[in-house]
Amino acid sequence: MPEVILAKSAGFCYGVKRAVEMAQQTAEQTGGCWMLGDLIHNTHVVEDLARRGIRKAASPSDLKAGDTVVIRSHGELKSVLDDLEGRGVHCVNATCPNVCRIQMLVAQAEQEGRQSVIIGEPHHPEVVGVASWCRHALIFDGPEAVKMWLSEDPHNREIPLTVVAQTTCIQKLFESSWEILKKECTNVKIFDTICNATHKRQTEAAEIAGKVDVMVVVGDRKSANTKHLTEICLRRCRRVLQIENADELSPDFFNGCSVAGLTAGASTPAG
């Protein structure tokens, strides 16, 4: 058996742990409640929550007056929240506080007449939700998209910009993106909104991957931060495997391996 180096940062991050606990408490208090979509990006945890009386609504229209719904850790569209509350649906906001901060930064930028720029995955629920807190956010998935936008119109360089990041964005990708904007544009405010847990997890994963023969990353395939951990590990280790559970591991993967590394995404429980 190879020696195994386990990442100390593995396990639920604060925001995910908080959302799961809030959902469980709400279900106990109400005798059953709803989550709108997946509360977190972990199929096994979502299935466990369903067994505890937390049903999944596929659409806001599935909820009626008097229902209680727990808002997922990634946040929700502002228009959806306004609609639910307007129809008498009780919303328990389990949005990660770090995501709430980004929502407020974007809303404040709107009030100040500034253009919001989000560095992250355009279709990720967190990014889509954050973008809804202003009229029109620019979403860039990296420095190449930033360069393309700048090349479209010379006047873009004169627009007052407020730049934020998806909480699970890769640190180097965010930095390389805002550095271009800071260099090329005349009025830029930059907020590093990558959460500390994400930064710590990414740094530790890179350190471990550089010391091992093989690296295993555990997390749901829908999880952005798990995908990013895998990408980071691949830069330091040639043999990296992303799995959702131990059943996906094959003994053959560890052939010739003396030291193996193990880390996990923020939506993966430690136990």
Regions found by a protein language model. Give the residues of each.
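The feature marks the mature, well-folded catalytic cores of soluble enzymes
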Residues: 1-271
